[in-house]
């Protein structure tokens, strides 16, 4: 098998030009936004402005659903890409003239699909079960992160579970019964796209975790946690606040010396301010268990952009765009915009968290994709057996 590569001599398609223009526009907006929100006063004013939408019932459900979705959706698409690689391996082995183990035992592939799906559903159901009504500081019935009833989180968890299980099933069906029937499935096509996406996942999440751990930036709700607790009391939920003050596991605010972590965090917290020391956050501020739990940069946007890679790579890869594919891409772009606003509205991420994520992840995705556009591997799965 020859792994040499050579330059492709092909013109850039109109759809690629449109994508480049869209990405360029998104990058430019993010750059401008990041420059302005590097001033903490502007970042804070935007957080205060967007927070106003969280008082509306429908906005709460939308925002919390996206917050939950952003932490889980990527795994579904990682499994898609892994199965593309496995499918490609089986397809390559089954096309050879010689009999081999894989050609004689094609049932193994279906077993892999079934096993992966069942394991995913079981794990997802178990984790969702334990997350429903789980205590995160307010005890049963309250949510110490959103400062609301836990019903919002519970409903969104269930909806997310259903969507993921259905989505994974549909995706596996398409990969196994649709994509593999493409006559050039193995020729510089789906398996290469899967490798690119998994590469982006590895690099991007390494960067994300390191930056989050280094800066340990609090979320907006952590900064104003004292005010939020007062509002919860005014809304008649003294029991939630009392429960929070009498527990020591969850620390969402600032510790003034009483170990309650029930006050606003003083000072300014722009994205470039290090909380305590590198990977050593101040013990008097909000505490999280993992590096990736902190605010800067946004893992939600990172995950959603990588999901977009899967849509873009697989729907436009050497194929004509159909109305259905255009619709799916348009829906994805709406999803991306929706995610960008939702995680600000619920007092979570700062605008600077989001704009910065676009600034470094878009170039990584762009360079990874267009490196493959100019170089191609020869003789990988393209023999006629």
From Swiss-Prot:
Keywords: Membrane, Transmembrane, Transmembrane helix. The keyword Membrane applies. This is Uncharacterized protein MCAP_0865. Its main location: membrane. The chain crosses the membrane at residues 17-37, 72-92, 107-127, 155-175, 191-211, 295-315, 326-346, 354-374. It comes from the Bacteria. Coiled coil: none annotated. It comes from Mycoplasma capricolum subsp. capricolum (strain California kid / ATCC 27343 / NCTC 10154). GO terms for cellular component: membrane. Signal peptide: none annotated. It is found in: Membrane. It is a multi-pass membrane protein. InterPro entries: P_Acid_Pase_2/haloperoxidase.
